[in-house]
Amino acid sequence: MKRFLIIFSMVLFLACNGQSEANPEETRDPLKWPFSQTSIWNMPIGLGAKYVHAHIEKTMAAGMTIDEDYIVMMPDAPLMDIAQNFAGWNRNKSRCAVEGKVLFSAPIPQSWIVSPETWDGATPNAGLAVLMPDRKTIKQTQPFAHCTAGQPATSQYVFENEDIYGDGMYGAHGGSGLSAIGGALRLGELTPTSGPIRHALKVNIYGKKNIYYDAETKGFRWPAIRADGYASANYYTERKLETVKACRMGALLALPARMNLDSLDFETKPARILAEAFQNFGAYLVDDTAWDVYAIVTEWSPDGRFDDAFKRNWGFSMKTNSKNTAWARDMDRIFLNLHVIDNNTATTIGGGGKTRVPLAPPFRE
């Protein structure tokens, strides 16, 4: 029945919103390209989109950062117990210790180590999305750690299950309640030969300067279901530019349709590819960076880390401390020009109207 309702909703949505023509022979692997055609993660921006300049303030603390989603799409792997740990984001406590009951068991290779020695930063967001043995159910939890091979993993919060064939909106990005797999840059994307990125992205920005809060909106908008717990005392407290009420947690941020991307004079090829994705699909605001930087969400899985592949392909990391590099300057070119799609709603995903590019192809049988 649930699958029928998803299909019915998709037909109704497409009847009300035009779409560009797709390649009728193309298919996709749900493990690499999940969720329905009309999921927020797959829906292109429409010609009916209404753009409001976000006026994101230029970052000062670093040139660019990433936020890694832990993605495990290995449903045939042996089951690993994931037990309770209550360290959370307290830097004085360890996420490695088992401190309570087993939350659930999931197919994750024991050889995959996610620990203070391997992760970035002191207390990363650490959202895990793992495909269960039924090859359909995605479980999500946060903050995940697996510090020792042969031992249980740990985490604290468990989110509602998602269907890999469904809309996949929600999950383990705690600042917004949005997915820890949808929107992530996946291994095999953004290479010299992979072609355009064909899904929405996810970004984090600095809440104190860029995420609006008031008592009415509580600092978030659809599809986010919340903002950070500290939002009322934190968001917009260091804002210098004009107020942009539309730029709240969950906002769909995009380069406007009228913008000629070549006019931005990108210095690096991967930035130009990213810019096209920001224009055709946009990026959902899913977390606060909590320091004065931009972040794009990327995959870390047992198969590898996106940034390692990026370095092999392009000769430099997505992460840079310096603002005075070609990549950092390109990130300013993108983020400082982002606009909120202000009419992005459940019935007009991407703003509605004919889509800028074709919808995702059907799933491979």
Segments (PLM) and residue ranges:
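Short, linear, compositionally biased motifs with a strong N-terminal bias
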Residues: 10-11
